Amino acid sequence: SNIPVIIFGGRTPISEHSHFGCRNTPIGYGQEMRDQAALVRESVKWDFELRYADQAGEHVDRAWAIANSLPKGPVYLSLPREPLCETFATDSAALNCRPSQQPISFSPAPDSLSMAATLIANARHPVIFSQRGARTRQAFDLISTFVEQWAIPVVEYWGTEVTISAAHPMY
């Protein structure tokens, strides 16, 4: 439903010895799934398994950007026990930086906008049918102003996000 979510899933250890967090009890063998991410792979936009603790910041950054790119949706990060047991410097630049990867947003080609404007201007009774909403506050305000100035009704059929206010005269 276009909702950005980061899902974290813990895993049993991936190593047999020599690493803090390795398998040290028999229960780890019985509970291990060969491909845990397969449970969610068909329902998420991206999945990844963290292998080293000091990469947590960059992978969460990437997960956030992908989850928030249109169409927004869930992503999955698998966390084996070893990286969760590792120690690393918490003042690491990778952990304490602003997001480096930004969500992607799409814009129509300028000639497509021109064509749409011509169709709307020449329509006898234009109506806007919407489902996915305005997406941003700026778009919400622009659409609200546009439909009021042009007296174009907006119908939200099976809406998942709001396009204009339900109190708007053109709603």
Locations of regions flagged by a protein language model:
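N-terminal alpha/beta PP-like core and its mobile active-site loop of ThDP/TPP-dependent enzymes
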Residues: 1-171
